């Protein structure tokens, strides 16, 4: 059986608007989760090309007590329901790391979440992509063996395979590289 190809997406800043700084940098309620239309279009391209889509996200706010694991999981369920009901788009899975820095091998930049999803779902990491807005996302993708796309970052210092100045450019890039 052939392994599936996948596009892994970071969450905050790629799927939804990035929260602020400090304690406010954690999305703690569904009411504060604002889906980016550019992500919806990117997901449409991914699925049209036969790729699976998985969200992999560090959620340190769980370890720090700013948000409960149950609330994070409820937000992810709401996201999946919204994508399916409103856009007829699906995600294969959503994986999050609830740990603080240095407590695990799943928190990006470690590749643990990507490798776990590949093992769980039979994904071909070498034929897959990681999309993120931080260099930790890019490092996780590279360490897992994926090609990488950096969005909204300092293009001059990123080690990503592709670098984009804005989310609005992601659907077109995916159309060209998938």
Language-model regions, residue ranges each:
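A short alpha-helix capping/helix-coil boundary motif
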Residues: 19-23, 58-59, 92-93, 115-118, ...
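Short, solvent-exposed loop/turn segments at secondary-structure junctions
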Residues: 14, 60-61, 136, 155
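Asp-based, Mg2+/Mn2+-dependent phosphohydrolase catalytic module
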Residues: 2-3, 7, 70-90, 101-130, ...
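Metal-dependent phosphoesterase signature
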Residues: 15-37, 60-71, 86-87, 99, ...
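Ser/Thr-centric signal marking residues that sit
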Residues: 14, 57, 148
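Substrate-recognition element of Asp-dependent hydrolases with the DxDx(T/V) motif
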Residues: 39, 43-79, 90-102, 141
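Short glycine/serine/threonine-biased micro-segments
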Residues: 11, 59, 63, 130
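Active-site neighborhood of HAD-like aspartate-dependent phosphohydrolases
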Residues: 1-54
């Amino acid at each position: 059986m052939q392994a599936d190809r996948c596009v892994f997406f970071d969450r905050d800043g790629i799927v939804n608007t990035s929260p602020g700084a400090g304690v406010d940098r954690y999305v703690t309620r569904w009411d504060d989760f604002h889906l980016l239309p550019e992500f919806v279009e990117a997901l449409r391209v991914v699925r049209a090309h036969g790729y699976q889509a998985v969200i992999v996200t560090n959620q340190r706010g769980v370890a720090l007590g700013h948000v409960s694991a149950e609330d994070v999981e409820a937000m992810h369920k709401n996201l999946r329901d919204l994508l399916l009901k409103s856009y007829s788009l699906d995600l294969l899975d959503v994986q999050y790391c609830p740990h603080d820095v240095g407590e695990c091998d799943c928190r990006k930049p470690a590749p643990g979440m990507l490798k776990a999803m590949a093992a769980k779902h039979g994904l071909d990491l070498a034929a897959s992509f990681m999309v993120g807005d931080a260099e930790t996302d890019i490092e996780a993708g590279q360490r897992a063996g994926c090609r990488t796309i950096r969005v909204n970052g300092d293009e001059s210092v990123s080690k990503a395979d592709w670098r984009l100045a804005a989310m609005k450019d992601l659907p077109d890039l995916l159309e060209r590289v998938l």
